[in-house]
Amino acid sequence: MASSSSSFPSSSISSTSKWTYDVFLSFSGEDTRNTATDFIYYALVEKGINTFKDNQKLEKGKTIKPKLLRAIKESKFAIVILSENYAFSTWCLDELVEIIDCETKKEITVFPIFYNVDPSDVRKQIGTFSLVKHEKHFKEKVETWKAALSHVADLAGYHVKN
């Protein structure tokens, strides 16, 4: 990650900018909150990069909070840390849809990190990225989630095996 830090601003975005945050971190807290996500977060903050990281545990079945949607829209970059449990979280999937929507409108630049997962599993929605587990309760959202996962898997990113 250190080699990519030059892609980010060296200091926080000015108050006249439309961005409140330099970077928005999207991650599954279950697998990465205290490991990869914290490492990335503190490395960015140490470089003076204003980074949004949601610190709350998310309740199952709750919809994505307006605060998070606003933080995505107010960020210049998004780092999406795709890990083993990412697709188990409907919250993460909803967040990803919003990030990809902003990316396709050229409002945000997305950097995926495939953390202990194969990018082709994300692209094809197989293994832990299969959305079959969600089809019964979230049928209306599954196709949108699949499209977002395929899109993020096609972006240039980092494949990290720990």
Predicted regions and their residues:
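Conserved N-terminal substructure of TIR/SEFIR domains
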Residues: 1-77, 108
